[in-house]
Amino acid sequence: MLALQSPELDLLGVTTVAGNFSVEQATVDALRLLEIAGRDDLKVYRGANMPLLHEKSEYAATRHGQWWSDAPPTTPPGGFARRTAEPLAAVQFLIDVVNAHPGEVTIMAIGPMTNVAMALRQE
């Protein structure tokens, strides 16, 4: 939340990934959080829906995967955001933004690194 309000940071976008919750839940939550914070200028890009190294059944059985499922996302506090995620995939967004600003982008990954790993694999 502090980063969203910081004048020192130039946030370029938000990517989501499956982690403690499904990527769908992470995406609707990110959209709602940005709306509450008054940051509708930031686009949200849906990311990886599975970890790279585990099967779905293994992942769902872990402590952090206990809430992860194919169920539709639950309604965030205050309802769903008025907008939706961008059609561009998170991995492609990361590749595009880093290539557009070489040496200037710092990725602040606060969840699983799956999107970053997939972007590195592709480039």
Regions found by a protein language model. Name each.
Residues 1-123:
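N-terminal acidic, glycine/proline-rich low-complexity segments
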